[in-house]
Amino acid sequence: MSRLACCAALGVVLIASCGKAPDAPDTEVTQGAELPAEAAQPVAGPEAVVEVPRHLEVTKDYFVGSASFDDALFDIAPDIAATLVEDARARLDAMDADALAYKAADPDYFNPYSLSIQWTLDAAAGDLISLEGFTAAYSGGAHGNYGTDARIYSLQTGQQVSLRTLLADPQGAMTESLPFVLSDIAQQRSEKAGGGASAETFRGETADAISADSILRGELGLVASTEAGRFGGFVVHFAPYEIGSYAEGAYKAVVPQSVFRDFLKPEYAGLFAGGPVTEE
């Protein structure tokens, strides 16, 4: 089966200007960051969530920003959706203020800023859901930047859950998954290069940048399965520059659940079955 995924992430450190202009104030969009409680109170209950916007947009001469959210997320996890909306609103407001300040400080070198945030519900099984995000930002440099994000949430608690939590032997699971990730990324890099280098050559280069430990520390989410109501595996995201050059862009690798199933905690094993749903 195949699925189109429109993803997006809160987690890009905006690049500074590369020209002769003085450095612009940095705006950081930190991966996985939580707003202080007073800044992002989840909306309680479905009736309150009706008032939460599902799309945010800012259009000014110095800043253009937007944030969009998967409609399904409001149905299955309204409180989580509300928190993501408020988080995105705060980030848009922060970059708006940053852009305005830089424009006032150095109008001759200023270029309008932009920020786009998207969140998609990727998969759900049992008490867990997995979200995928995409963030694209420009803060006056030679080019913009973008990044992907992945988050797993518990519907019962509304809190984020790490893949590590689901595994009885996290290190063993990542060690088993590493060869699969290396081969997958190497094949993608070879295809992007148009056959300029073999997948085996890229595999060696990729192995210098990726380890079992780095995968476990990375952006990890769960993916839908060919069997309804189950997870088919996990996905690991790599931002631009993390593996190759900026021109290569971001990468992600999907590891089938069959690769790491033996390392799952018994209470979570039943949530995994079938094969991963892949993108077209």
Q: What is each model feature region?
A:
Residues C7-A8, G19:
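Secreted/luminal cysteine- and crosslink-motif detector
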Residues M1-C7:
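Bacterial N-terminal signal peptides that target proteins for export
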Residues G19-E280:
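Compositionally biased intrinsically disordered regions enriched in Thr/Gly
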Residues L14-S17:
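C-terminal motif of bacterial Sec signal peptides marking the signal peptidase cleavage site
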